[in-house]
Amino acid sequence: MEMERINENTIRVLVDNDDLSARGITILDLLGDHQQIEDFFYSILKEVDTDHQFQNNDAVTFQVMPTNNGLELFISKNDSNFAGNEQHGPINDQVSKYIKQHLIQKNSPDQDQRKTAINDSEDNEIQHTNWQVITFDSFEDLIDFAKIAESDDVSSYLYKYNDLYYLAIAYSDSILNSNDVKDQLALAYEYGNPTATTVDFLSEHGKKIMSVSALHLIRHYFE
């Protein structure tokens, strides 16, 4: 982990994937759990703020920028010169939304079309009736399946609930009963297990980690 003091009010911290791993955290963990985001950022602050100039300030704010190898974090303490500066916002939904947007943009050269498609179709997609839900005991099992899964013709969502990962795959009516789907599900059950848990339940009670193209994103970032 690298730290650079930009000025008396701002610290820049580079957190690579090894640093995240050492803390038992992945980029995926930071996508939806706001309390975990806050705890993680303040743990970084405690580590780099050795003279306690920032920890004792009630108006500390954070900016996060995903990088190819982790995160770039800007920690600022607000004083009268920073009051009203919209560039420095508190920890909120923008953190996880920014990371999600970065993952999607990096994954596709047609990023504008993809973002539009996701925004327009996600609410409708979640109402799809032909869902197959598979549960995985570990994220490593899910990665192993994603590496060999055929995902071009399906939408897939990733949820976490009670420390288990749930992969929800939406199949169209035209291919639901095809041999290809049966073969893919049989393959999925070698790494995970079928479950009666519904997408509606996961949407209400679980934490959604990835939308629309979960299998493709997992394969891309964890190959």
Swiss-Prot record:
Signal sequence bounds: none
Gene3D superfamilies, per the entry: 3.30.70.1950
InterPro entries per the UniProt record, alphabetical: MecA_C_sf (IPR038471), Neg-reg_MecA (IPR008681)
Alphabetized GO MF terms: protein-macromolecule adaptor activity
Function: Enables the recognition and targeting of unfolded and aggregated proteins to the ClpC protease or to other proteins involved in proteolysis.
Quaternary organization: Homodimer.
UniProt record similarity statement: Belongs to the MecA family.
Record comment regarding domains: The N-terminal domain probably binds unfolded/aggregated proteins; the C-terminal domain interacts with ClpC.
Protein name (database record): Adapter protein MecA
Organism: Limosilactobacillus reuteri (strain DSM 20016)
